[in-house]
Amino acid sequence: MAACVLRQGLLSTFRKFNRKHTYRALYFNFHSTGDLQRPRLLCSTWNIFDIQQKRFMSSRPEGKVLETVGVFEAPKQHGKYETGQLFLHSVFGYRGIVLFPWHARLYDRDVSPQAAESKPEPPGAHGSKEVKGKTHTYYQVLIDTRDCPHISQRSQTEAVTFLANHDDSRALYAIPGLDYVSHEDILPYNSTDQIPIQHELFERFLMYNPSKVPCFVPRDTLRAWQEKNHPWLELSDVHRETTENIRVTVIPFYMGMREAQTSHVYWWRYCIRLENLGDEVVQLRERHWRIFSLSGTLETVRGRGVVGREPVLSKEQPAFQYSSHVSLQAPSGHMWGTFSFQRGGGDMFDVAIPSFSLDSHGHRDSPYSFLF
């Protein structure tokens, strides 16, 4: 997996995954065309590439030999990527392929976009400023399973979780290797390999057609799967806030409702990315959640770290991403809170988690039996 990170259009990193045997390097060489104003960027400190080369490499697991896996394309400044677009994730470095886009409403507390929609604050939530929503493109993608071991320390091996399609309210299933990726995190490339991504759903969802651009086109099974499971896959709202150079992005998803004795229990999944935008090394130590339910209850949850980890965010590895779940005995509610971080000197500081809605959208349960 090429593990270079593009930030604000600049890519200049070399990562050594195995100190004894395996090296991965990335060369990024965009020519100045159109509105793409970027310098030529070389991700090699040992002059192992010819200066005219425009490919990124992925090493074979058994040795030092580098093999070509594709050729970079210029990122799209306007418009969206199509189904079948191969890409490298600019933050986590994995290879992936676009399945289809989502048009989300981004609520960014760090800017004041000119948009018509706004999100009101829930009772007791921090802050009082109005937040405007702006349309932003995200993508449902498949992750190359070969790259999952290399990103496990910075991100969970992403999976879409869902409730079982039978009466067992405790059952939770997952489709591993699915992720949601923002438009600016896409580094597009092309490949002549007919199976460039290793994932059990790749050949089920996509087929190779060299006469098309991109050359991987959707099968009917992908269209049917998207249509059938649209309510539970749909990404609608994204919330973002930065405190002392730590940016927190939250994406909630409604999963469905289950009956529990005499009440209904509504379930949501939420994905959180923590990103260090500064140079100082910090470590996440604690989480503090407040969960407000439409039924009138307010719950406080405290704990060490997140998902059993206390990730360190540094300039070399600035981001960490994870997913979790929450349930309410009401069709809607709100969540917000803080993360406590520790600096190198030992002092602590709090980072705000932006308030986000838990909405059921009036959905009724639909089975996820299509893939199984």
PLM feature spans:
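Short, solvent-exposed secondary-structure boundary/capping segments
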Residues: 104-115
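Mixed-charge, Lys/Arg-rich low-complexity intrinsically disordered regions
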Residues: 2-8, 12, 16-86, 92-93, ...
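Intrinsically disordered, low-complexity Pro/Gly/Ser/Thr-rich segments with frequent PxxP/GP/PP motifs
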Residues: 299-332
